[in-house]
Regions:
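A short, solvent-exposed, low-complexity linear motif enriched for acidic/polar residues
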Residues: 22-235
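C-terminal motif of bacterial Sec signal peptides marking the signal peptidase cleavage site
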Residues: 17-20
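Bacterial N-terminal signal peptides that target proteins for export
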Residues: 1-8
Length: 235
């Protein structure tokens, strides 16, 4: 099956705040919590240079199989020597991307300073079973104010690769959280009003999948490469 790849640049919030619970300086490890969230649940569509009524999404989930972290680790800030390390979390887990708690999993970090960080998230059809790897549903409102149900079903393997900005460092005396935002506006980039008005409907619903409205599916599938929106903060 085809693999969808995505590079997301992490934005580092410099003004990090300490958590309400004080950390024990002698603790054996810290953690990096990895979350995924879908942003922009409602937005308009482009028609001949102007915006028209568009999408309102109500359900979005992904079946995540694995999270891998790779980084360069130093014992402390002044150390000149570094070691390439890898950590791994394995699921699978169905994550509600519109939910308050969209946590995928926690990666344990041994004490030290980490930079050149990359996080790889993989979602395999073999782990999803009868469920989609990625699922998005809601409605499309056309120019005459008629709401039409829309469903996007991705059953290909998905691989998301997250890379930190140059200069980003994690000091593992603290816990951290990375929030990966899938920007739904960017995911639907290139989908026009005319595309949806002419789309095939199944029982009154626009189903976008590998077997239904394939041209729209191909556009959306390609857009996973450019949904670049994320946050990185101390937990």
């Amino acid at each position: 099956m085809k693999t969808l790849k995505k590079i997301i640049v992490l934005a580092v919030l410099v003004g990090m705040i300490f958590t309400s619970c004080k950390k024990d300086s002698a603790k054996s490890s810290s953690s990096l919590r990895v979350k995924i969230h879908a942003s922009n649940k409602t937005f308009s569509l482009l028609k001949a240079g102007s915006l028209t009524p568009g999408f309102a999404w109500d359900t979005c989930y992904m079946n995540v199989s694995k999270v891998e972290l790779e980084a360069e680790k130093k014992e402390n800030e002044s150390s000149q020597d570094s070691t390439n390390i890898e950590f791994e979390w394995k699921g699978s887990k169905k994550v509600d991307l519109f939910g308050i708690n969209s946590l995928i999993g926690d990666i344990s970090l041994q004490p030290g300073v980490y930079d050149e960080i990359s996080i790889e998230i993989e979602a395999f059809k073999s782990d999803a079973g009868s469920s989609p790897v990625f699922y998005l549903s809601g409605s499309y409102t056309n120019a005459t104010e008629i709401k039409i149900p829309v469903v996007v079903i991705v059953n290909d393997d998905i691989q998301l690769k997250v890379e930190s900005k140059e200069g980003t460092k994690l000091n593992a005396v603290n816990d951290y959280m990375t929030m990966i935002n899938l920007n739904l506006i960017l995911l639907m980039n290139g989908i026009l009003k005319s595309d949806l008005d002419s789309a095939t409907r199944t029982n009154g619903k626009i189903v976008i999948s590998s077997t239904s409205n394939n041209s729209l599916y191909t556009k959306i599938k390609g857009n996973f490469d450019s949904c670049e929106d994320s946050e990185f903060d101390q937990d």
